[in-house]
């Protein structure tokens, strides 16, 4: 499994960034770069076979291959194992996931592997509402999701212990500068919410 981290600077916090169907692309690398000023070490493991990275125009192929392997459940298990492997070196292990990476983060949050999680527009969380995170979890949705009702899902999560939901008036992918749905304003707002929720400081 491919993995990248910054050189350790004596930080006691690790942040794992979980990728979308495309793998560790420029968006995920950009997220890692944004985290550099914070007091943490950043990891961007690749969970696709052979560390492959798909271009955005290959979305259909990327989706087809992802559903074949590792799939959401498989990525969730691999992510939990990866996070557990960091515990020997870090007091806190946090996870930030996007899209399928967000749903995988949601699954991992129910295993005790992470100490805090942020899930950016994990649309398939709706298929795993039986999960009870064992650590604080912020679930950020785009208001405009064509495949499901965001209010219906947030209503199911509102009384869930340790779970906070946040909805932005945007479309799926609004935090990705390379997406046609990118919103600089709401991306900045969501990022501020995420770092505060995880207790990350500069």
Question: What role is predicted for each listed range?
Answer:
Residues 1-88, 176:
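Serine-hydrolase catalytic machinery in alpha/beta-hydrolase-like enzymes
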Residues 113-123:
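A conserved short beta-strand
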Residues 164-202:
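C-terminal catalytic histidine-bearing segment of alpha/beta-hydrolase fold enzymes
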